Amino acid sequence: MDIQLGRSKVVRRAYGIDEIALVPGGRTVDPEVTDTSWTLGGIERSIPIIASAMDGVVDVEMAVRLSQLGALGVLNLEGVQTRYEDPNPVLDRIAAVGKDAFVPLMQELYSQPVQESLIRQRIEEIKRKGGIAAVSGTPVAALKYRTATVSYTHLTLPTNREV
């Protein structure tokens, strides 16, 4: 289903996790004759899962484990993993905070700058442990931190302007 966005842009409808329900079908498919593999920029994966680039979801260990299982974990280029040498105490603070104190805490935590050295370190850790290093960031961050990631890049995805 296409949606008109502005005067000249048409976009596809996307769905969130709370909008999707899986219901068993009327037909049974033998697992031996199915193929769930997919390819992105020459990287083949066997499980059709891309884990969200959220601090509470993907860290170095999760990215490596997902790679080993055949999926893809994406690290948040602008999250706590690249702002703090040890992000675990920060994540513990986020998990423990109440609703009223959440916004001030996030403002405090995200006031720390992203460290290019941590971007490099996290990518190196993932690759050294045998994982596929994938990162996600805003377009501004992609340009700002390209020197921290470009030497590790093995594929280039086209932008909307190139498509």
Regions found by a protein language model. Give the residues of each.
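Active-site entrance/lid segments in N-terminal catalytic domains of soluble metabolic enzymes
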Residues: M1-L155, R161
